[in-house]
Amino acid sequence: MNVFGQIVDYKSSFTRSHSFSVAEKVTKMARFYGYDESTVERMYIAGVLHDIGKMAVSNDILEKPAKLSETEFAYMQTHAWYTYVILSQINGFEDITEWASLHHEKLNGSGYPFGKTGKDMSEKDRLVACVDIYQALSEDRPYKKGMDHAKCMSIMRDMASRGLIDARITEDIDKKLSGEKRSENRHK
């Protein structure tokens, strides 16, 4: 699985370690929640592969150094659908497919690719989504500098207060990840 994560991460210089950072943090949180080791390992795989659909997205979009247009953003959003399409072809990956492909869903139904609501999302779906947000906020991207833990948590708490992401998982991320330094993915 790691080779697929490496391919995804190396597709764009600005997400060079994103998939593995998500996988590592998802693993820490899964252990924090006391999931059995088999589930922890499967969640790690979901973290590594959650952006595999970006292989279908042009690097011109992935590395654009400015805000995406509405059309470009809609195109970028297709990566979550392609993650679902790719992973759903693998027998025995049903749970991994769900956790990986729902990482942009929001509890109020405003997310993508399926517009699921909180009642349709498991705790593990919500966990991968929250960790992906945390990781994305902490990383440098073509259009922004990475944020420190306190700023990431402020944004995530705001999102939780608006019913977008799970408030309990957000607070648990603060407890478990507060001592970690910002992402090593720095670009000067």
Identify the meaning behind each predicted range.
Residues 1-188:
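Histidine- and acidic-residue-rich, metal-dependent catalytic cores
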